[in-house]
Amino acid sequence: GSGKSQTTRRVSLILRDMGYRVAAIRHPMPYGNLVKQKVQRFATYDDLTKQECTIEEREEYEPHIDNGVIVYAGVDYEAILRQAEQEVDIVLWDGGNNDFSFYVSDLSIVVADPHRPGHEVSFHPGETNVRLADVFVINKVDTALPENVISVRDNLHSLNPTATIIEAASPLFVDDPEAIRGKRVLVIEDGPTLTHGGMAYGAGWVAARRFGAAEIVDPRPFAVGSIIDTYRKYPKTGTILPAMGYGDEMVKDLEKTINNAKVDMVVSGTPIDLTRIIKVNKPMQRVRYELQEIGKPTLEDILKQKFGKK
């Protein structure tokens, strides 16, 4: 939930504009048959369906595919790298919430979240990534408390005083903001952000408030099956519905919970189009968010200095 994926998308677009062929390699999410998943390549939405991706995997892969960037994942990360090297000039390691890069990189960009000040020095592997970084992106400065931004900046500098620090906003985009105004809404956020990410809300909640929803309805009375179990395990989740989908049963429970909810519409802050995998009986507005650097240097400045135009 810090903004790693949107940062990777921004980096990939810059590198492509510079003339480079780019692929993203995601850290492992081994939910299925690990033998079949030795090397996975995703270039189309059909690839996601054929390889039986979970919602969590789709949340990471779909935005890259939307931008025309090939995604690799799987189990054998040397074999994955060797295949990616055959078709691209630059590999982007897209991960970090559960690990640090499996590859020795030429440039390490680490995202810090001022909505969770202190996590950058108190959590593993975040603290390790801080020490390895060449560049920090302090994201969401447009919605964080100024004192928290300062605290994160000071913490990063104390652990890694030579790294460059970029501040960035995370502006929200909704297809029809007026559709939200005055409505009773169900807010959905990506599951990992709310659960092991420890966030109480995400982009969907911010958009619902910003665009004038009359009420954010508590989804818990409408929850079924595994969604009930998720709320018990992560009670801080509160009035937001986590888009849990680690298997077919969970996806069905998510669909039933959404369709049970007595609301006017759904505001979805997940990075994917949920309607591709579930049938929803009420209107849905997707919230999109991109990285917007503030001031200089920008990521483009740093990437051009490091790699130059092809």
Q: Where are the language model's segments positioned?
A:
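Flexible phosphate-sensing "switch/lid" loops adjacent to ATP/NTP-binding sites
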Residues: 2, 6-157, 161-167, 172-285, ...
